[in-house]
Amino acid sequence: MIEKTYQPADIEARISRAWEDAEAFKAGRPERRDAVPYSIVIPPPNVTGSLHMGHALNNTLQDILCRFERMRGRDVLWQPGTDHAGIATQMVVERQLMERQEPSRRDMGRAKFLERVWQWKAESGGVIVNQLKRLGASCDWSRERFTMDEGLSRAVAKVFVELHRQGLIYKDKRLVNWDPKLLTAISDLEVQQIEVKGNLWHLRYPIEGKTFDPADPSSFIVVATTRPETMLGDSAVAVNPEDERYTHLVGKHVILPLVGRRIPIVADEYSDPEKGSGAVKITPAHDFNDFEVGKRHHLPQINVLDIEGKISVADNSAYLEGLPEGAREFAGEIDGTDRFVARKIIVARLDDFGFLEKIEPNVHMVPHGDRSGVVIEPFLTDQWYVDAKTLAQPAIAAVRSGETTFVPKNWEKTYFEWMENIQPWCISRQLWWGHQIPAWYGPDGKVFVAETEEEAVGNALGYYVEQEVITPAQAHDMAEDPAKREGFITRDEDVLDTWFSSALWPFSTLGWPDETPELDRYYPTNVLVTGFDIIFFWVARMMMMGLHFMDDVPFPTVYIHALVRDEKGAKMSKSKGNVIDPLNLIDEYGADALRFTLAAMAAQGRDIKLATSRVEGYRNFATKLWNACRFAEMNGCVAPAGFDYTAAKETLNRWIAHETVRAVREVTEAIESYRFNDAAEAAYRFVWNVYCDWYLELAKPVLMGEEGAAKTETRAMVAWARDEILKILHPFMPFITEELWAVTAPRDGLLALAPWSRKGGISDEEVSVLAASAATDPMAGPAMLAIPEPQEPDFTDDAAEAEIGWVVDLVTAIRSVRAEMNIVPSTLTPLVLAGASADTNARASRWSDVIKRLARVGEISFADAAPQGAVQLLVRGEVAALPLKGVVDFAAEQARLEKELGKAEADIKRAEAKLANEKFVANAAEEVVEEEREKREAAVARKVKILEALLRLKNAS
């Protein structure tokens, strides 16, 4: 029996246990051994993480797909797991050590510290997994993976070694994003651009051979910088080759102020003649653009900072090279000072000597570490790199050929732009937590790359014996006793970028490099669901690695979902205080309400503006479903075994069968094409409007009437349609539907494993494709041979739809006019059907009691034409008239509507004035501009509705 009130908290934990006990989500269930496989890999959340709204959206959409395909009979693997999250995890544990006043990471040493990290992971690393379960994620939790599991670590080592052997991994000195607090290189994704009110310092660089005079512009070139401290590392001044002001100076030199270094004036298109003086200082070791200019002109790379962001020039051979003796004194003065302290010293000294032309206030974006919060430095250092350009070519070709497609398609352009301009990928990090790079160094710096230490040591010792650096006896002793080779062979201390192991996720989680049955069955996966912000960092790299090591794309479809913003459209952030916690929403409204909200708002390419009122609204929808099922139960609605909905005799029941089949088709096609919002809308509209508001309402007289064939059939149809509803809603609202499935009738099993509504199995098109593959591919596995029967044609009953649809449309139109004209419910209005066809007359007679009750209509009459003073409604091509003379004061109603029209027009004018203001559009926050657009659209819609009402009044009077 169904409880009187719907309380999600009472059912969610119980339903979760039922799924777990039945191993409902386990891939490779015995009864699905021959089913068509369907697989998705979860974007692994950080092991340090907790569920945020982005996770909630991403995993809700994946779960909709997995539950949908599982109900269609497929063998579904939704592969779960977590990422070791190098920096984040190391910081969490270091913070814990500090809070507990324990020895620091460095005092503890690497081995002991890593033990503590693993201990923390065991104690606290499963938080987000449990939160995903609360959301209802139907992953195969028995297969949960971690990016530092033994098997995945072996895959990482093998990939590194293979790519190194192929010349696609190498060591190089290049610029990286350097975090002076965490003392490591970080990825672009870990860099946050923050708007800062700073300055632009305009500096005078004296031209060699001329006497410097601040009053004589011909004696110097002006350059501008936001980072004056980096001038210590300048190695050129660049001007545009087309800039006639400087043509005569190209090839000459300037003398770097304070430093005394002689640096060339080079011609390069990087310099923009329209910006500032048109000349720019070039610091190859401290600016990414300057680094490229430096390569083009073979300029020296002079690093003037140490790893902590302090000036390092006193013993810096690159800095000191070629400097006059007198200039070295300044190096001693400034050496060891913090970069921002040095900035003040340098600016003051430049001003003292007349080298500072002006200081200009300047608001600009400054890169900060998203975890450390400090300003990031472009820093020249030795790191390990992947030749991403070579690996990118097959990945570009796969998307160009359509082997992998993006949904929405416009994201392919973003993918191509990045891939076609891809830079070497820095994969080393100066951390302790992560996959330690499998490279060992000999005493002369020679590198030995191998999957295991044993192999690397063997290779190294063999090499040095051959080179006669050590004897065979020494080599034997070193091989046997690690202590004897200490200092002779040392391992690279760096670890790999977290994204390196994540790039292998689609195949490493399936057992690669071993040739496992799971790898053969579930790779490639069917779709990747992810956010646009990691197209470069994760999607592109999985494409590269999948094609290189598996010789196949990791997924044929990439679905890119949008951002979840606050209700005004602003990006959620802790600093703004507008972060909405999904767990709080689950506690208050239930997981199903949150899931349905996210799905209903997940229109392709459009960010979600999340308001708690929407979640509350869908909680009400869940309550509506609950109450509809209680109504069916209280009226004894049960579908007997073998019930055939297509054999229904009653027009109303044939209509609901027609509408149910249509709703199933709409939901199915929308999910298949990743139109989650359309699928949710179709389900919502059918359940609330068609089934609850109309079918159950129209069926009440039968259900409450005398026993007979009509009542028996209606009870069965109410139950059948209810079950179809539970099926199409299950991917969106799994908890409530599973509960109602269990309590509404005796069942053979869980709804999660029940067959999908009518269109069971897979699409007709897919059936034909699989059949063709099975017929032509001798290697086709059992899954390929499990071809479902072709689908039967959709059930339709156009006559039933025409009849009941007319009743619904007529009542809806009358209700709309009554509301529009403020007619009180107690006032019954007459209805005249003007020039009605014989079919319409017959329908009106059959359904007169229903029309009168639901539309608050008194007498229903028929006439050749609409009477004077009647509001005319067009219902399915025929006129229905409401004689309202004496019921409505037409003049007063017209005055009211005209007043409303004036307000709507004023709102339109106000919004359009703002949107026409270029300064407003350019400077206001994106969400504020979008809000004005929405105000305009709402006012325009209101105006159209009022004009329609005025036209009706005019025609009536």
UniProtKB/Swiss-Prot annotation:
One GO BP annotation is: valyl-tRNA aminoacylation
Q: Which residues are in coiled coils?
A: 887-946
Placement of sequence motif 'KMSKS' region: 571-575
Task: Please give the Gene Ontology molecular function terms for this protein.
Answer: aminoacyl-tRNA deacylase activity; ATP binding; valine-tRNA ligase activity
Which keywords label this protein?
Aminoacyl-tRNA synthetase, ATP-binding, Coiled coil, Cytoplasm, Ligase, Nucleotide-binding, Protein biosynthesis
Superkingdom assignment: Bacteria
Q: Which residues bind ATP?
A: K574
Q: Which reaction does it catalyse?
A: tRNA(Val) + L-valine + ATP = L-valyl-tRNA(Val) + AMP + diphosphate
Where is this protein localized, as stated in its record? Cytoplasm
Q: What is its EC number?
A: 6.1.1.9
A single Gene Ontology CC annotation of this entry is:
cytosol
Under the heading Pfam families, the entry gives: Anticodon_1 (PF08264), tRNA-synt_1 (PF00133), Val_tRNA-synt_C (PF10458)
Q: Where is this motif: 'HIGH' region?
A: 45-55
According to the UniProt entry, the note on domains is: ValRS has two distinct active sites: one for aminoacylation and one for editing. The misactivated threonine is translocated from the active site to the editing site. The C-terminal coiled-coil domain is crucial for aminoacylation activity.
The record's note on quaternary structure and interaction partners says:
Monomer.
Q: NCBIfam families of this UniProt entry?
A: PRK05729.1 (NF004349), valS (TIGR00422)
Family membership = Belongs to the class-I aminoacyl-tRNA synthetase family. ValS type 1 subfamily.
Tell me the function of this protein: Catalyzes the attachment of valine to tRNA(Val). As ValRS can inadvertently accommodate and process structurally similar amino acids such as threonine, to avoid such errors, it has a 'posttransfer' editing activity that hydrolyzes mischarged Thr-tRNA(Val) in a tRNA-dependent manner.
Task: Specify the protein name.
Answer: Valine--tRNA ligase
The source organism is Rhodopseudomonas palustris (strain ATCC BAA-98 / CGA009)
Instruction: List the lineage, top down.
Output: Bacteria, Pseudomonadati, Pseudomonadota, Alphaproteobacteria, Hyphomicrobiales
Record gene name? valS
